[in-house]
């Protein structure tokens, strides 16, 4: 069973926990207090403040120096500006598959007013598609 928790969704902040993955970090650190110790990877979609809060990223990086951050190339400078070490960042290319020990992921292109991606997540035979802030999803599925 895939466990998930919607921490926040909407224009004031977005953060979703799926198993031990946090997708988007547009909330205060206080809202993550019950989950931040249990996440192994933070996936980021784009730079808008309701998805990416620099103060929270800074605090996560400081509190959890072994925490991994995953994103497409356009987010790397933003993470480094928040004090995340380049050695903590997994950089993804759209359409490629990346295998971790207990899950895999593949970033998908989304259409927004800034560069944006979603994620296909694979947990064995189970799949999750995470997509937000997009004008279209033509041809996109969880396959």
Please state what every model-predicted region is.
Residues 79-88:
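Short, aromatic/basic amphipathic alpha-helical patches
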Residues 16-18, 94-102, 121:
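Short acidic-hydrophobic surface loop/beta-edge motif
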Residues 8-9, 25-27, 47, 74, ...:
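Active-site metal-binding loops of divalent metal-dependent hydrolases
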Residues 12, 30, 48-52, 76-78, ...:
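Active-site environment of divalent metal-dependent phosphoester hydrolases
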Residues 1-35, 117-133:
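Conserved beta-strand hairpin/beta-sheet module of binuclear metal-dependent hydrolase folds
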Residues 28-71, 75:
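Active-site metal-binding motif and surrounding structural segment of the metallo-beta-lactamase
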Residues 89-93:
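Short acidic-hydrophobic, aromatic-tinged amphipathic segments that line or gate anion-handling sites
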Residues 100, 104-143:
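Metal-dependent phosphodiesterase/nuclease catalytic metal-binding core
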């Amino acid at each position: 069973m895939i466990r998930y928790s919607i921490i926040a969704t909407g224009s004031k902040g977005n953060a979703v926990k799926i198993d031990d993955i946090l997708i988007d970090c547009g909330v205060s650190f206080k809202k993550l207090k019950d989950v931040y110790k249990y996440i192994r990877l933070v996936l980021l979609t784009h730079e808008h403040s309701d998805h990416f809060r620099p103060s929270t990223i800074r605090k996560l990086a400081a509190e959890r120096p072994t925490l991994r951050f995953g994103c497409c190339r356009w987010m790397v400078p933003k993470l480094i500006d928040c004090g995340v070490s380049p050695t903590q960042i997994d950089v993804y290319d759209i359409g490629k598959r990346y295998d971790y020990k207990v899950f895999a992921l593949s970033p998908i292109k989304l259409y927004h007013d800034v560069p944006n991606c979603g994620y296909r997540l694979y947990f064995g035979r189970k799949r999750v598609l995470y997509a937000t802030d997009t004008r279209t999803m033509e041809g996109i599925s969880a396959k």
